[in-house]
Amino acid sequence: MPCLALLTTGGTIAGTGAMNRYTAAQLGGQDLLAAVPGLGALADLRIAEVFALDSRDLTPAHWLQLAARIRALINDPSVDGIVITHGTDTLEETAFALHLLLPAHKPVVLTAAMRPSTALSADGPLNLLQAAKVALSPESIGRGV
């Protein structure tokens, strides 16, 4: 079975509360996985909670820390793909920084959510499942972040 690394950084995907009044970065990786029952059947999972922040609070120093963690996973022959949960405010900046900082030979996929995990019709679980499928797809190898 393939191995998928899940790195959590916080954001709305890990937020709790109502849609219009929530607190970002409240849930850890196990909580996020519990909302995606089929994910464990796709891969062996490794979870690392890197940050628990609202993404607007991430800085270039955080990007460097995250890149170092990902680089170690890229160099681990047992890891097939990497998914990072993130907030929407700075997801594209983080993705671009990681794309520039990391080698592209293993899939690295960022995902986020527009609605917190406890909101009606939360979008995070499906986003996480789809990100995992992309990260585990052989077609994603060599395409960067």
Label for each model-derived stretch:
Residues 1-145:
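Active-site histidine-anchored catalytic micro-motif
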